[in-house]
UniProtKB/Swiss-Prot annotation:
Disulfide bonds: none annotated. The keyword Coiled coil applies. GO terms for cellular component: nucleus. This is Homeobox-leucine zipper protein ROC1. Residues 106-165 bind DNA. GO terms for molecular function: DNA binding; DNA-binding transcription factor activity, RNA polymerase II-specific; lipid binding. Signal peptide: none annotated. Residues 290-522 form the START domain. The gene is ROC1. The lineage of its organism: Eukaryota, Viridiplantae, Streptophyta, Embryophyta, Tracheophyta. Belongs to the HD-ZIP homeobox family. Class IV subfamily. It holds the Pfam family Homeodomain. Residues 104-115 have a biased composition (Basic residues).
Length: 784
């Protein structure tokens, strides 16, 4: 008998040598010659060392190598298992071929990877979840594993992560569905208990009001948006889990819950006087941040402050020079390299807008900081840019009796004076700091993870201003505006303006601040010369009249934009020149006449520079050329207040010398203002008795106003925007974008129904005014 040759050991997992059990047994000459059995034995010994993957993702490969995998070998979340296996009792004297085929399979034991191997593969998985053959072989050599063991571990890990994400997203979608069902039940209950505001009886569903119809349309739109986002999320498996937040109530749900619960008082102080055509939007009813989130908010605000200071002070290569003076363009690649922290990469579907602008303004740094940190003052000073604002929570009031270290969670809605440009809502934290070099900085940064909204269309990266004290009560302000927005809804005629940064950029913020600082200085001036006819010299009279004009301009700006709180209805026109109208009821408001007010607005392009349009509209001698309500009568300026260096910045009191005796007691209050970003001419009829009270220093809040007017913007950056708008009211440039808006009291009874005749009359009024303005300004710009 020939002695059996000892087989070499097979190297298994973890470097352990496994000897063949049959190597200890004597073989006959026939067995030695049976190469087929010998080959099967060697193959069985080799494949016994290979791990078996048990996940669904690797069933096919597993079946080829091992037959059916054991179901108990699934890898748990915390520890990966190698399914390398040895048959128990391998040394019982029977080879694989000699075992009884009817005998029940032996219980298999599993060998776990070491903690070091798991940690190394986990770290590699974070960097590369799909290693190639070369990477797997390298990893197997480093960890003492077979390449197939590494391959199957990564297969198991990928399947595990996929299952986790699918479970999380399914739970999230189920929660959204439950909320929608509960919301639908609230709607049904609210409709079933609805009562008539006039008689108190049950309201007939067939008599749905105009506002209720729009609320239903808005609710349907929100449902479609949630379905669309859910569909997109279901396709992107493998992304990090999205933190689930409660969906904000729709306007109808808010209206239904307003009676038993004061939501406005529960969610923050909404700035009074800004919400003039409807309730606050969902964003401005944002929730308070949780206590657990406040450390993250503080950390984000500190990082944003560091970023803002650097962006305000650094030049090239971060900022490249621009054709406009004191303006700069941001290098996106350099920005991403310098500031890897913060909000992270740009979100899909959003476009970056970044700008920087500086100016010296006539105001102390302490007063500027107070305006920026007081939401009421901020909304008043920037009423042409901010349509609505609220502070949800004050996390810190500052130290040492000032705003150093103040931290506030806020939300705002930013606007352009036209119904063709949607407003931008933002939910952010505002942080104020006194830097070591003596400068003050105020920064805003969006709270993306806390924003309770399924759709985000505006994200504020670190934006704000750096304030440096100057002699004689002046301050140098450097403003940085950096946002990511979805501007797909902007009308085509306004896209060049928006893309240039003149609509929402830093230049508009600084220009508005500079003009308002001059206005405040004018209101406080006491050395007014008495030589000019009609100039109001009384300090109290000037303050009261300027305050009344300020409210008039804020009311005009807040009522002409495409805010989420406004529901515009398109009447007629073609394209951009459609006339849009909306109604509101004025009740118990001393600043507005009671009744139903109809607001109509339209925007159009003029081939005339903005400065020429501004001079034509503010000049009282040319008013009869476009003002139909003056009945062709001559207009005379009765009083005048200059409130800036530019002679176009003024408040005037006008008298219309009309043949109609019914208008003998009516005056017109008008404010005209212009800066480097745009111009306004706003006016309102006022009672002569009420104006006498104001001129004597009386309270202007009780003067009823229905402002109308014009907003004049450049049509883009072409032709040098500064020359196009004119810092001194003159200059030449490209065309103009003109918005015309009227407010008309159509019925003095707030509960009356709006008639189609009133709408048709206002539509004809605004259309006729537009045609007159086009004819007049085009004739003046092209004299024969």
């Amino acid at each position: 008998m020939t002695p059996a040759r000892r087989m070499p050991p097979v190297i298994g997992r973890n470097g352990v040598a496994y000897e063949s059990p049959s190597a200890q047994l004597p073989l006959t000459q026939a067995d030695m010659l049976d190469s087929h059995h010998l080959q099967q034995a060697l193959q069985q010994q080799y494949f016994d060392q290979i791990p078996v993957t048990t996940t669904a993702a690797a069933d096919s490969g597993d079946n080829m190598l091992h037959g059916r995998a054991d179901a108990g070998g699934l890898v748990d979340e915390f520890e990966s298992k190698s399914c390398s296996e040895n048959v128990d009792g391998a040394g019982d004297g029977l080879s694989g071929d000699d075992q009884d085929p009817n005998q029940r399979p032996r219980k298999k034991r599993y060998h776990r990877h070491t903690q070091h191997q798991i940690q190394e593969m986990e770290a590699f998985f974070k960097e590369c979840p799909h290693p190639d053959d070369k990477q797997r072989k390298e990893l197997s050599r480093e960890l003492g594993l077979e390449p197939l063991q590494v391959k199957f571990w990564f297969q198991n890990k990928r399947t595990q992560m996929k299952n986790q994400h699918e479970r999380h997203e399914n739970a999230q979608l189920r929660a959204e569905n439950d909320k929608l069902r509960a919301e639908n039940m609230r709607y049904k209950e609210a409709l079933s208990s609805a009562s008539c505001p006039n008689c108190g009886g049950p309201a007939a569903l067939g008599e749905m009001s105009f506002d209720e119809h729009h609320l239903r349309v808005e609710n349907a739109r929100l449902r479609d948006e949630i379905d669309r986002i859910s569909g997109i999320a279901a396709k992107h498996v493998g992304k990090p889990p999205i933190v689930s937040f409660p969906v904000l109530s729709s306007p109808l749900a808010v209206a239904a819950a307003r009676s038993p619960l004061d939501l406005a008082g529960a969610y923050g102080v909404v700035t009074p006087g800004l919400d003039m055509f409807g309730g606050a939007g969902d964003l401005l009813r944002g929730v308070h941040p949780l206590d657990a989130d406040k450390p993250m908010i503080v950390e984000l605000a500190v990082a944003a402050m560091d970023e803002l200071v650097q962006m305000a002070q650094l030049d090239e290569p971060l900022w490249s020079s621009s054709s406009e003076p004191a303006a700069a363009l941001l290098d996106e690649e350099e920005y991403a390299r310098m500031f890897p922290r913060g909000l992270g990469p740009k979100q899909y579907g959003l476009k970056s807008e970044a700008s920087r602008h500086g100016a010296v303004v006539i105001m102390t740094h302490s007063n500027l900081v107070e305006i920026l940190m007081d939401v009421n003052q901020f909304a008043t000073v920037f009423s042409s840019i901010v349509s609505r604002a609220s502070t949800h929570e004050v996390l810190s009031t500052g130290v040492a009796g000032n705003y150093n270290g103040a931290l506030q969670v806020m939300s705002m809605e930013f606007q352009v004076p036209s119904p063709l440009v949607p407003t931008r809502e933002s939910y952010f934290v505002r942080y104020c700091k006194n830097n070591s070099d003596g400068t003050w900085a105020v920064v805003d940064v969006s709270l993306d993870s806390l924003r309770p909204s399924p759709v985000q269309k505006c994200r504020r990266r670190p934006s704000g201003c750096l304030i440096q004290e100057m002699p004689n009560g002046y301050s140098k302000v450097t403003w940085v505006e950096h946002v990511e927005v979805d501007d797909s809804s902007v009308h085509n005629i306004y896209k060049p303006l928006v893309n240039s940064g003149l609509a929402f950029g830093a230049k508009r913020w600084v220009g508005t601040l500079d003009r308002q600082c001059e206005r405040l200085a004018s209101a406080m001036a006491s050395n007014i010369p008495n030589g000019d006819l009609g100039v109001i010299t009384s300090v109290e009279g000037r303050k009261s009249m300027l305050k009344l004009a300020e409210r008039m301009v804020a009311s005009f700006c807040g009522g002409v934009t495409a805010s989420v709180a406004h529901q515009w209805t398109t009447l007629s026109g073609s394209g951009a020149e459609d006339v849009r109208v909306m109604t509101r009821k004025s009740v118990d408001d001393p600043g507005r006449p009671p009744g139903i007010v109809l607001n109509a607005a339209t925007s159009f392009w003029l081939p005339v520079p903005p400065a020429a349009v501004f001079d034509f509209l503010r000049d009282e001698t040319s008013r009869s050329e476009w003002d139909i309500l003056s009945n062709g009568g001559a207009v005379q300026e009765m009083a005048h207040i200059a409130n800036g260096r530019d002679h176009g910045n003024s408040v005037s009191l006008l008298r219309v010398n009309s043949a109609n005796s019914n208008q003998s007691n009516m005056l017109i209050l008008q404010e005209s203002c212009t800066d480097a970003s745009g111009s306004y001419v706003v006016y309102a009829p006022v009672d002569i008795v009420a104006m006498n009270v104001v001129l004597n220093g009386g309270d202007p809040d009780y003067v009823a106003l229905l402002p109308s007017g014009f907003a004049i913007l450049p049509d883009g950056p072409s032709g040098n925007a500064q020359a196009a708008v004119g810092e001194n009211g003159s200059g030449s440039g490209g065309g103009s974008l003109l918005t015309v808006a009227f407010q008309i009291l159509v019925d003095s009874v707030p509960t009356a129904k709006l008639s189609l005749g009133s709408v048709a009359t206002v539509n004809s009024l605004i259309a006729c005014t537009v045609e007159r303005i086009k004819a007049a300004v085009c004739r003046d710009s092209n004299p024969q």
